[in-house]
Amino acid sequence: MDKITVYTDDSALSNGRPGSGCGWACKLMYKGQVRMKSGGAIGETNNRMEMQAVLEAMKSITDKTIPVEVYSDSNYVVETMNGHFAMKKNRDLWRKLMRERQKFTSIRFIWVKGHDKNQHNNDVDRQAVAESRKALEAQQG
């Protein structure tokens, strides 16, 4: 069966501190095609960046009827998206994520061990770190 496979990751240098460089990345794969999306921010947290990566991935999928599997090394994101954790913090992003999720016919969230031998997870990790460094450099001028 055809499915879209997504890997997401975050980076937060000096996590949550004002002026910290942060980044997110997502890698979408479907029928041999691969697309990487990423971005950066200042002063965010690793959790918010991971959530942003998932949100950007979901928003970029145009055909919401194709089954999707989202792999993340964030237990916080995976368990909350699967309904096992309460949405106490970051409610603004959780609302956006849940609204976007409702548009899909089939979407699963799967935890993957980070900083291990999974090439796709390592790819998004490298990209998220690069984005956090780029955001920090841009801020410092």
Write out the residue ranges for each language-model feature.
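Short, conserved alpha-helix that lines the donor NDP-sugar binding/gating region
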Residues: 50, 54
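Short connector loops/turns at beta-strand edges and beta->alpha or beta->beta junctions
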Residues: 29-34, 73-77
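Short, flexible loop/turn segments with low-complexity composition
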Residues: 137-141
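Extreme N-terminus of proteins, especially the signal/transit-peptide cleavage junction
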Residues: 1-3
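RNase H catalytic domain
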Residues: 5-18, 55-123, 127, 132, ...
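Short beta-strand scaffold segments in enzyme catalytic cores
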Residues: 22-30
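A short, polar/acidic, helix/strand-boundary loop motif
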Residues: 31-49
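Short, glycine/acidic-enriched capping/hinge loops at junctions between secondary-structure elements
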Residues: 17-20, 37-38
